[in-house]
């Protein structure tokens, strides 16, 4: 594979990993920086290609989810264990962790992957916390 083909392949892979919001921003930036002659005919001028593109985008929106992790409550007898877990988990100091659990419910992570959200929930629940994971469709 030549260098241009390899570059294009990697570019497409990276684009496919992007969220709809990210794609929208990239499109706007490209529109600002690239001027295309009005006589230029692209593949997207074909309605069937546009429709399949819409289907792919709609499917991608459903697949691309981000999650928020909300710490709701905790077992008071495990307060110290939870404070230690929070300090390690979200890299905050002792006072910040103590203040955080005194003002529940609190969102401790926003826009994280499903796997990360589930692992974090498990860790917090092992420390006596009650945790909710909410999803955001991007």
Swiss-Prot record:
Biological-process GO terms, alphabetical: translation
Domain of life of the source: Eukaryota
Cellular compartments annotated: Plastid
Pfam families, alphabetized: Ribosomal_L12 (PF00542)
Sorted UniProt keywords: Plastid, Ribonucleoprotein, Ribosomal protein
Main localization of the protein described in the UniProt heading: plastid
Cellular component aspect of the GO annotation: plastid; ribonucleoprotein complex; ribosome
One of the record's GO molecular function terms: structural constituent of ribosome
InterPro entries assigned to the protein according to its UniProt record, in alphabetical order: Ribosomal_bL12, Ribosomal_bL12_C, Ribosomal_bL12_C/ClpS-like
Function description: Forms part of the ribosomal stalk which helps the ribosome interact with GTP-bound translation factors. Is thus essential for accurate translation.
Subunit structure: Homodimer. Part of the ribosomal stalk of the 50S ribosomal subunit. Forms a multimeric L10(L12)X complex, where L10 forms an elongated spine to which 2 to 4 L12 dimers bind in a sequential fashion. Binds GTP-bound translation factors.
Family membership noted in the UniProt record: Belongs to the bacterial ribosomal protein bL12 family.
Name of the featured protein: Large ribosomal subunit protein bL12c
Organism name: Euglena longa
Phylogenetic lineage: Eukaryota, Discoba, Euglenozoa, Euglenida, Spirocuta
